[in-house]
Amino acid sequence: MSSIKFQNIIENILKKCQDNRHSQDSVVRAVHSVIHQYNKFEALMPDFSLCVHDRIKFTGEAILLTTEHTTNWGKVVAMLSFSAAVLQTIDEEYKCVATSMLSSYISRSVGANWFIENGGEKSLVEFCNSIMPQNPFNVLNFLVPAVLAGLVLMQTLLIK
């Protein structure tokens, strides 16, 4: 799989997260669950009165730092969730470009090879199904470490 094809997969997931018609999609449900349960995303984001470009760059740098040492499906879902949360703060006229840029950061961070070697989109869906059972507290067991790691890295970026 080429990195461009992988980026397109990520971009399509982010687009589905912005569109309410895909609420039965397990990846979209997992992303929305993380955003809903961790409204702290908004509180930890920098002052987004900054231009859209700076928002995307900040988010992208945080994404790249998230998988610096290891990658797992929890971190991938956390990156998708954080990106979707940021996209909610962006005006409609910039969303297409922002979605493309964020998907580029995620695809660079995760890597097409890692994605394929770990089962691709099918495994991502299976992971999301496994963390989205009837008991919503199971989501916490898988995503809290990944989300918190991403947020700590963001705070580190803010300090620099």
From Swiss-Prot:
- Which ranges form a coiled coil? none
**InterPro entries, from UniProt?**
Bcl-2-like_sf, Bcl-2_BH1-3, Bcl2-like, Bcl2_BH1_motif_CS
The domain of life is: Viruses
Report any one BP term from Gene Ontology: regulation of apoptotic process
Q: Which residues form the signal peptide?
A: none
Pinpoint motif BH1 by residue range: 64-84
Keywords, alphabetical: Apoptosis, Host-virus interaction, Inhibition of host apoptosis by viral BCL2-like protein, Modulation of host cell apoptosis by virus
UniProt record similarity statement: Belongs to the Bcl-2 family.
Entry protein name: Bcl-2-like gene 16 protein
Report the source organism.
Saimiriine herpesvirus 2 (strain 11) (SaHV-2)
Upper classification of the source organism reads:
Viruses, Duplodnaviria, Heunggongvirae, Peploviricota, Herviviricetes
As recorded in Swiss-Prot or TrEMBL, the protein's gene is named 16
